């Protein structure tokens, strides 16, 4: 079962009127444009903003939202999580940030790193 703090953090990225994630909310909270968010998610900007592709967009944005929600939960602050995501190199990845890894399709590695930090592997 998901941690209640994680569920609350993740819910901040959704639409209030639909069960889908909101690209606009995610881009605002992360401080990036929709075009930059589309590149991070690996979809076109048109796909990101089109209503017909909501499920595809959810699938593309879910790893990013999981990362941001987890980082927010751990840092206690959504803004610090966004700054960490964009600017803090992750140990062992040659100076790459979480944003760099997500952009190259390695969101799962970032999630594994966050889980390791949560478990006390990295201090």
Model-derived regions: residue spans:
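Non-transmembrane "mature" sequence context
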Residues: 1-123
């Amino acid at each position: 079962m998901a941690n209640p703090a994680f569920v609350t953090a993740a819910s901040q990225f959704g639409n209030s009127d639909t069960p889908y994630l909101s690209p606009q909310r995610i881009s605002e909270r992360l401080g990036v444009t929709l075009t930059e968010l589309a590149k991070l998610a690996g979809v076109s900007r048109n796909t990101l903003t089109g209503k017909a592709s909501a499920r595809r967009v959810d699938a593309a944005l879910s790893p990013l939202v999981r990362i941001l929600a987890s980082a927010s939960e751990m840092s206690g602050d959504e803004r610090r999580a966004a700054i960490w995501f964009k600017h803090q190199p992750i140990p062992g990845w040659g100076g790459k940030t979480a944003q760099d890894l997500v952009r190259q399709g390695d969101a799962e590695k970032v999630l594994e790193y966050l889980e390791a930090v949560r478990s006390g592997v990295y201090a």
